[in-house]
């Protein structure tokens, strides 16, 4: 019995051995609720006739059949495929969306995506729907999948999508390749090889698109890094100013002769000074001029505390050997820039 023949035990109105049109089966809703046995080369396998109708509908671009099955459908799991329900696939591991992407069936792919079809399922060849659209030059379907946020960072056999696109380049496919590259670049595809080298195209027009996009990415990256450095600098400056105020306040309030190590303010002060020393030390490594003035202005204030820590034992949990405020340590890191 061929795959397109309907078993007599399933639909009694069909004579044995005759073919039943798929369209007529589809209009009956779910004609087969159980999986009949289909013989192939004398080997019986379980075959889902309902899903086969859908697969054939995709190949023949029968949008009405797909839409009928998507309305109140109980077995096309759509977005649930990404959770605990395994997706329905054909023998190649293709879902309906992957099949639509391969064949370039734009309207069917759109109907499936609108119904919530999961985009990142991988077939037995390691392809997602987006990879299939790239490999088969399905530009409109590719744009549609990108619009539905398909993952453009995915790799196929170690290659990113831009490498895969350029690998299939030829003079006959130049226009398709150009449009695919434009779409992928706009979507944020990776523009470097895995070893960090720049991806380049043999075609000058395509290579210029990639080069311009890469330069733009570099500019944006440098801008983000500059903004981050500015935020870090501002944060450090605010911290320095706050600690300076604390030092000046406590220095005025506590005479040098008084044992400040026994005062309630000392633990917090000690923490603030330690933090300050660390900030200035790190900042001088990055930019010696940036915090030079702040470092010099605090040497005198910290010098007194350093001398006190040298002369006296620190009470409580604060131990002399644990501090960074000994004269040899704290003052050396706060010395004028070298």
UniProtKB/Swiss-Prot annotation:
Low complexity bias spans: 7-19, 325-338
Acetylation keyword on record: no
UniProt feature, compositional bias: Basic residues: 20-31
Swiss-Prot/TrEMBL GO biological process terms: symbiont-mediated perturbation of host transcription
Keyword Repeat: yes
Gene3D superfamilies hit by this protein: Ankyrin repeat-containing domain
SMART domains listed in its UniProt record: ANK
A Pfam family recorded for this sequence: Ank_2
Organism: Coxiella burnetii (strain RSA 493 / Nine Mile phase I)
Full protein name: Putative ankyrin repeat protein CBU_0781
Coiled coil location: 197-242
ANK repeats: 92-124, 125-157
Keywords attached to this entry: ANK repeat, Coiled coil, Repeat
Region (Disordered): 1-31, 319-338
